């Protein structure tokens, strides 16, 4: 099985950016832990981060026919990007939306997600463990529907 992990804008600053909200783990720490977890499940995990919407859209397109599922933390694009939503719909790959913080307990503009409507599920608010929960949920979905 092959899963793509996508991280959007400013997530490259994890561990430095607002640690009271996002914690002290770096993106590299999160990716390494999730890669180890995926390997234990015999899953290949590809990780990609970009601050650019078009680069994320391109990477989603490249996943078509190559990946069985996608984990996506689109960062602020979650609340603004119809392009990412349409790319995910276009490739028809099951995906789970993931966030470190509980977006529903934050500013009002973070309460709406353009991605959630088509997602297998949404995991938020558990810090770095959100990624592990999202991977487990996605794998469970993929195995049930294989």
From Swiss-Prot:
Enzyme nomenclature, EC number: 4.2.1.10
Keyword Lyase: yes
The keyword Lipoprotein is annotated on this UniProt entry: no
Catalysis: reaction(s): 3-dehydroquinate = 3-dehydroshikimate + H2O
Cross-referenced PROSITE patterns: DEHYDROQUINASE_II (PS01029)
Pathway entry: Metabolic intermediate biosynthesis; chorismate biosynthesis; chorismate from D-erythrose 4-phosphate and phosphoenolpyruvate: step 3/7
UniProt-listed GO biological process terms: amino acid biosynthetic process; aromatic amino acid family biosynthetic process; chorismate biosynthetic process; quinate catabolic process
Pfam families reported for this sequence: DHquinase_II
Annotated binding of substrate, by residue: 73, 79, 86, 100-101, 110
Active-site residue numbers: 22, 99
GO molecular function, one term: 3-dehydroquinate dehydratase activity
Enzyme class (EC, first level): lyase
Keywords: Amino-acid biosynthesis, Aromatic amino acid biosynthesis, Lyase
UniProt site positions, description: Transition state stabilizer: 17
Function: Catalyzes a trans-dehydration via an enolate intermediate.
Subunit comment: Homododecamer.
Family: Belongs to the type-II 3-dehydroquinase family.
PANTHER family: CATABOLIC 3-DEHYDROQUINASE
Protein name: 3-dehydroquinate dehydratase
Taxonomic lineage: Bacteria, Bacillati, Cyanobacteriota, Cyanophyceae, Synechococcales
């Amino acid at each position: 099985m092959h899963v793509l992990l996508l991280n959007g804008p400013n997530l490259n600053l994890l561990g430095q950016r607002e640690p009271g909200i996002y914690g002290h783990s770096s993106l590299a720490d999160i990716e390494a832990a999730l890669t180890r977890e995926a390997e234990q499940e015999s899953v290949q995990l590809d990780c990609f981060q970009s601050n650019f919407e078009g680069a994320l859209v391109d990477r989603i397109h490249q996943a078509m026919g190559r990946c069985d599922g996608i984990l996506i933390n689109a960062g602020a694009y979650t609340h603004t990007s119809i392009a990412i939503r349409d790319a995910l719909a276009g490739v028809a790959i099951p995906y789970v939306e993931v966030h470190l913080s509980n977006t529903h307990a934050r500013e009002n503009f973070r309460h709406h997600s353009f991605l959630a409507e088509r997602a297998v599920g949404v995991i938020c608010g558990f810090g770095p463990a959100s990624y592990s929960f999202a991977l487990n949920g996605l794998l469970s979905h993929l195995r049930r529907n294989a």
